[in-house]
Amino acid sequence: MRRTRVRLTKQSLVDRAVENGVKPFTALAGLLSLALRSYLGKDEIQYSYSADTRREAGVPDALYNCVCSFQSGVKLNEDTRLADIVPEMDAEVLRTLQPEAKLRQMAQQMSWVYKVDRQKAPLRIKQRVFQMGEYISGVPADFWLSYLGNPLLPATPELQKYTKDFNVWVPPDGGSMGVEASSLNGIITLCIENKAEMPGLAGMIRTAFEKEDITVLEAVDLDT
């Protein structure tokens, strides 16, 4: 497992998002897709993201996990720029994050988890069955992107710790990379856990981001 850390200014990401009329989350997903085209050597990148469904389920303060996951993809070529792909990506994200869509997706995914858990089988068998469900449902992707922390509470100990600690997140079965984005003091930190064997991810992310005028403060492969 390779680890990569990238730090960029939040304002530069917000500026690119505003220029293209999309959310910063979508701009970040688009930037990562451009970088991974070079890194993975693929012209179509699949990405997944999760959404909190506690509010839609009527339990906004619940302490347990209450999420649903979505997957989408983007086709790229060597001339593709961020502005070419993010409008459609943003429309897809907004469509999936409607309350009805989130509840429907959560119900489908959690019903599968419940059915697997009810099986009278060893844990290793349940894990394999659950992995099969991930493949069947289309959840595996080239990268998973998620956000940690409440941006209105930027100084929480959990968030401060995570900018230095990768042990919270690993890629799911079928996913090449897990990307956790945290925002603290105007800096977005990407902690990336990568199953792919090729070196050089940090440099390719820096190149792709800076080509789109993102201010990259750090891009380093930690396991070289």
Regions found by a protein language model. Give the residues of each.
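Generic structural signal for individual residues within well-ordered alpha-helical segments
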Residues: V14, L28-A29, V86
